[in-house]
Amino acid sequence: MEAFSMAMFFLSLGQGVFSNVVRSRDAVRGNREVAIKIIRNNEIMHKTGLKELEILKRLNDADPEDKFHCLRLYRHFFHKKHLCLAFESLSMNLREVLKKYGKHVGINLMAVRSYTAQLLMALKLMRKCNIVHADIKPDNILVNESKSLLKLCDFGSASLVSENEITPYLVSRFYRYVFCFLHISFIT
């Protein structure tokens, strides 16, 4: 399985409609902990996974020094015909941070400023690469163990601006942008 052992898939981090994410160790990266997104093995999911891979490569290429806060793709491989994407492993998503550390009080203003600046850097990179994420929400924003570093993840719904058509179903219902309702271009 290309430097991964099934015994090394040691923790399920999440399950979704399109994929499962597990924590593992990557022998190719010095036994470093990684998160592996295992795309479901059917034609539609495989095609979507390949599109996500293309977008992640574009973002990585545009940010070789990893300064723009988009989750880093280390590599990809196939396991039992499943496309697998190996990423840097971060601690928890923003929803979990808010629930654990900000329940009933929110998080402090300095953290909000820092997170906002980092998220804006990710948006700046996506704009430079002509990419629309289309699913920005707390679940798709990861935070490191010390809660100082934030990265945007899950580019499974992302597309190039030139390929995009505004529809009411472009993003998750509760996080839908105003332009979706007004049918206004989101790139100006």
Segments (PLM) and residue ranges:
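Protein kinase glycine-rich loop
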Residues: 10-16, 21
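Conserved N-lobe beta3->alphaC-helix segment of eukaryotic protein kinase catalytic domains
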Residues: 38-67
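Activation segment/activation loop of eukaryotic-type protein kinase catalytic domains
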Residues: 142-172
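Conserved end of the kinase activation segment
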Residues: 180-188
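Conserved alphaE helix
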Residues: 68, 80-84, 89-147
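A short, aromatic-enriched beta-strand patch in the conserved N-lobe beta-sheet
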Residues: 75-76
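Glycine-rich ATP phosphate-binding loop
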Residues: 20-40
